[in-house]
UniProtKB/Swiss-Prot annotation:
Gene that encodes the chain: rnhB
Molecular-function annotations in GO: manganese ion binding; RNA binding; RNA-DNA hybrid ribonuclease activity
RNA-binding among keywords: no
UniProt protein name: Ribonuclease HII
Swiss-Prot/TrEMBL keywords: Cytoplasm, Endonuclease, Hydrolase, Manganese, Metal-binding, Nuclease
GO CC annotations on file: cytoplasm; ribonuclease H2 complex
Species of provenance: Brucella abortus (strain 2308)
Cofactor binding, note field: Manganese or magnesium. Binds 1 divalent metal ion per monomer in the absence of substrate. May bind a second metal ion after substrate binding.
Cofactor requirements of the protein: Mn(2+); Mg(2+)
Length: 220
């Protein structure tokens, strides 16, 4: 299906910071509660993929929301607490490395998103999803927004919640598995992480055995 220009924004089309205009367009159609959905952890060699769904209060929007990748860790942590306080409802879901290996990362990420929406205490009227895919099986209609975390404050809020949640999980994993430095790189393929995998081997249940360079290098 051909994508519209709004689905694939050019860099100069993006706002300086995400705003509430995407949500307002839906609200003009009578849709009251709009959920933003995003995930963290598609690319790492280790750990889960984590998705978050957030329904913001249009009358009490947190200030400073942005794509989590454009924020410092300290700023993400501060906004995370503000989002949990101000949002109407927030839900987080994750799929483990084993679940990722059993299917693939795209399917796992979409399933985590679906579960996050289902976990909301209030059923949204519509979901705005970061990326190009709407997860199958959502309990509400959804729209995919390319670079949505830079266009929609609801998606930006979800990106922050997902990122902070996953980073905290990887800090705990790092304490349990010191040689890998997971608390530093969150499971991504840094030189330190790759060297530790080569010397120590991958950890079952933690590392993604279907991801290169792990795939085919070890007896799993």
């Amino acid at each position: 299906m051909k994508r519209s220009a709004s689905d694939s924004p050019l860099l100069f089309d993006l706002p300086l910071a995400p705003d509430f205009s995407q949500e307002q367009q839906l609200m003009k159609r009578g849709l009251k509660h709009i959920a933003g959905i995003d995930e963290a952890g598609r690319g790492p060699l280790a750990g889960p993929v984590v998705a978050a769904a957030v329904v913001l209060d249009q009358n009490d929007l947190p200030e400073g929301l942005d794509d989590s990748k454009r924020l410092t860790a300290a700023r993400r942590e501060a906004l995370y607490e503000i989002i949990l306080t101000k949002a109407i409802t927030v839900s987080v879901a994750s799929l483990s490395a084993r679940s990722i290996d059993a299917s693939d990362i795209r399917k796992a990420a979409l399933e985590a998103m679906r579960r996050a929406v289902i976990g909301l205490t209030l059923k949204p009227c519509h979901a705005l999803v970061d990326g190009r895919d709407v997860p199958p099986g959502l309990p509400c209609p959804g729209s995919a927004l390319v670079k949505g975390d830079q266009r929609s404050v609801s998606i930006a809020a979800a990106s922050i919640v997902a990122k902070v949640t996953r980073d905290r999980m990887m800090i705990r994993a790092g304490a349990a598995h010191p040689p890998y430095g997971l608390e530093i790189h969150a499971g991504y393929a840094t030189q330190k992480h790759r060297a530790a995998i080569e010397s120590e081997g991958p950890v079952p249940g933690l590392h993604r055995y279907t991801f290169a360079p792990i795939k085919g290098c070890f007896d799993c």
